[in-house]
């Protein structure tokens, strides 16, 4: 059966769902196509993929109706920042009070953001969710585009939006070229328990190998770390024993929060800049990582 919509959003992650939620007061017919259904069960241990949401991001999420769902699940406000250079006196620190703000932002798991947005989108009568489903073909015409999904669904859309990540299927289908370069670093992420409480302060140290950030989570002695370092060293850090990793991490962070203890998995991913030459082409638009990564 053919379905006609005004906008088909490929990708139901944070960006795609935020875009769909932004049309909540419009008469436009929206379809969101996502290849997987997010697990709604939150483990006691936070996911290793988190985002630092600014106050501006909070304002947007409040307008979309998703902020309450984020706070009800899990969000960690941070009230101060400390940044320093290893083996140097260079240091900067500031807090929300000095800026007349209630906080500087929140550290939130990406999946929590996705679930809170999904909760809102599911309430919208003008949005249809196709989860799980993937686009298999796309044909772009002068007045509309035609899509087919792997579940047999066919649809037409006046605009197709790619919110399908750094390796965007839509961007590749449209042969949109990329400007890209490799930073020569990998980001290692993990959850870490610290001997001393973080006091809701985000901290980052710049070392000869690259920056290391400790982002405060909801539990007073739990941080999400982002460790940017050379690929070979990142691989070493991934495979070394927990005991060796804890010792290395504590030393690299100048023992600022006492002895560190990794909890759960460690993961790493390459840091690469990707920038689509065109964000908008005939009846197609790219948003989020599909348009540009860090």
Where are these regions (language model features)?
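N-terminal FAD cofactor-binding segment of flavoenzymes
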Residues: 45-86
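Conserved FAD/dinucleotide-binding core of flavoprotein oxidoreductases
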Residues: 207-270
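Conserved Rossmann-like nucleotide-cofactor binding loop
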Residues: 15, 38, 167
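Central beta-strand plus flanking loop segment that forms part of the substrate or channel wall
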Residues: 65-66, 167-202, 212, 220-221, ...
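Glycine-rich FAD pyrophosphate-binding loop
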Residues: 24-48
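N-terminal Rossmann-like FAD-binding beta1-loop-alpha1 element of flavoenzymes
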Residues: 5-32
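Conserved N-terminal helical subregion
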Residues: 73-173, 181-186
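Conserved mid-domain beta->alpha element of the FAD-binding
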Residues: 20, 269-294
């Amino acid at each position: 059966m053919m379905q006609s919509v005004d906008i088909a959003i490929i990708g139901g992650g944070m960006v795609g769902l935020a875009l769909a939620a932004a049309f909540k007061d419009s008469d436009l017919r929206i379809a969101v196509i996502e290849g997987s259904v997010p697990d709604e069960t939150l483990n006691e241990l936070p996911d290793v993929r988190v985002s630092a949401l600014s106050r501006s991001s909070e304002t947007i999420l409040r307008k979309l109706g998703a902020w309450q769902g984020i706070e009800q699940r899990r969000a960690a406000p941070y009230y101060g920042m400390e940044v320093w250079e290893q083996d140097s006196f260079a240091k900067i620190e500031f807090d929300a009070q000095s800026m007349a703000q209630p906080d500087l932002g929140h550290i939130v798991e990406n999946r929590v953001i996705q679930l809170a947005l999904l909760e809102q989108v599911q309430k919208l009568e003008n949005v249809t969710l196709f989860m799980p489903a993937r686009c298999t073909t796309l044909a772009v015409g002068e007045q509309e585009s035609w899509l087919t999904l792997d579940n047999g669904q066919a649809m037409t859309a006046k605009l197709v939006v790619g919110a399908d990540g750094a390796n965007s299927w839509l961007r590749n289908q449209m042969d949109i070229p990329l400007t890209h370069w490799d930073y020569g670093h990998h980001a290692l992420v993990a959850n870490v328990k610290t001997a001393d409480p973080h006091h809701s302060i985000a901290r980052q140290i710049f070392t000869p190998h690259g920056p290391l950030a400790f982002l405060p989570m909801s539990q007073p002695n739990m941080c999400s770390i982002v460790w940017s370092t050379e690929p070979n060293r990142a691989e070493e850090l991934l495979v070394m024993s927990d005991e060796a990793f804890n010792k290395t991490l504590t030393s690299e962070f100048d023992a600022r929060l006492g002895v560190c203890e990794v909890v759960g998995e460690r993961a790493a991913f390459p840091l690469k800049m990707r920038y689509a030459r065109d964000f908008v082409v005939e009846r197609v638009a790219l948003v989020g990582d599909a348009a540009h990564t860090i």
